[in-house]
Regions:
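Histidine/acidic-residue-rich catalytic or RNA/ligand-binding cores of hydrolases
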Residues: 194-202
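Catalytic-core regions built around general acid/base machinery
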Residues: 45-53, 134-142, 201
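N-terminal pre-domain/capping segments
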Residues: 1-104, 175, 179, 183, ...
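Hydrophobic residues within beta-strands of alpha/beta enzymes
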Residues: 32-33, 111, 149, 211
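Generic enzyme active-site microenvironment
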Residues: 31, 150-153, 185-188, 192
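Glycine-rich, phosphate-binding/catalytic loops in enzymes
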Residues: 22, 48-49, 128, 166-168, ...
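Active-site acidic/histidine proton-transfer and metal-coordination neighborhood
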Residues: 78-183
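Active-site-proximal loop/turn and secondary-structure-junction residues that shape catalytic pockets
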Residues: 10-12, 38, 62-65, 115-119, ...
């Protein structure tokens, strides 16, 4: 039996964000996810989760920035992660620390690490090396809290220039990252656009325990 989580960034948008938890619970959901929690106090979210008997299953690391204001502005400005961007290592580490503090407060055991959009000035090799270093660091920091770091291939039609697009690349990166708590978030929507036949990668990668 599949389990479904309500994505509160896209559902119940007629309600203020903190009221969406109750709406999801009333519709029978037992779990929720959303893009980012950073504009809200973690304890306010934790109260909504507990009051409505909901489990927080996933949210994203900051797309860039280190506090609520800069994170929100980065998203509006089109930033989609900095994990693959050279010279942004300190900012990445600060964003990771913030995400882990929120995850710990919300008892959330999975965080999505957005890769980022590669600029024309950045070589593929440099982006890949930076990404592996940041993912390894994220995995090490998250492991102490029992949290998984997820990497997700995203299609190039919706997000041109995004560093990570295909399942094969994601699983090759896992080999280089070599952290057991870094796994692939396999979104079938993105997979279908990029690779067409979703059955083949499901059969290939689900048995690995890395999805």
């Amino acid at each position: 039996m599949p389990n479904f989580a309500a994505n509160l960034s896209f559902l119940y948008t007629e309600l203020p964000f903190l009221d969406r938890f109750e709406a999801a619970a009333k519709d029978g959901f037992k779990a929720v996810e959303f893009l980012f929690p950073y504009s809200y106090d973690s304890q306010d979210i934790a109260v909504r989760l507990k009051t409505n008997d909901l489990k927080q299953v996933l949210f994203n690391l900051p797309p860039a920035g280190v506090d609520a204001s800069s994170i929100e502005q980065a998203w509006v400005n089109g930033m989609r992660g900095i994990a693959c961007l050279p010279e942004r290592g300190a900012e990445f580490a600060q964003g990771l620390d913030l995400a882990l503090r929120y995850a710990n407060a919300l008892q959330c055991k999975q965080l999505h690490m957005m890769a980022g959009i590669v600029s024309a000035a950045t070589s593929t090799a440099s982006a890949q090396q930076t990404y592996i270093q940041n993912a390894k660091y994220a995995g090490q920091q998250a492991a102490a809290l029992g949290i998984n770091i997820l990497i997700e291939p995203i299609n190039m039609r919706d997000m041109p220039g995004y560093f990570l697009n295909r399942q094969e690349h994601a699983h090759a990166l896992l080999q280089a990252i070599d952290q057991p708590n870094v796994k692939v978030q396999m979104d079938l929507y993105h997979c279908q656009i990029m690779e067409g036949d979703v059955l083949q990668p499901l059969q290939q990668y689900l048995p690995t325990g890395k999805v």
